Amino acid sequence: MSYEVLLLGLLVGVANYCFRYLPLRLRVGNARPTKRGAVGILLDTIGIASICALLVVSTAPEVMHDTRRFVPTLVGFAVLGASFYKTRSIIIPTLLSALAYGLAWKVMAII
């Protein structure tokens, strides 16, 4: 097995773990009272973790093959993370990240 596959699996595993674990830790010191407990937060974060894991697995071969896709992919991930942090929903961030990827790809093609 090549080291790229192992590295990709490790990267996806770490990202998935962080997306599930960090929201639980970041909410501990939050002064706002929440109606949901740790289980509710965990279930909410599974959506973003699975989307990001699928994005990494599906885009990594394309980025390795064509390095021009790196910047649009990075823009898509940044928009996904920022919009999920702001909205706490997975639907709008997924659509926004796809739009950001497409716009970044077009801008990169023009430049």
Curated annotation (Swiss-Prot):
Domain of life of the organism encoding this protein: Bacteria
One GO CC annotation: plasma membrane
Biological processes per GO annotation: L-valine transmembrane transport
Protein's name in the database: Uncharacterized protein YgaH
Native species: Escherichia coli (strain K12)
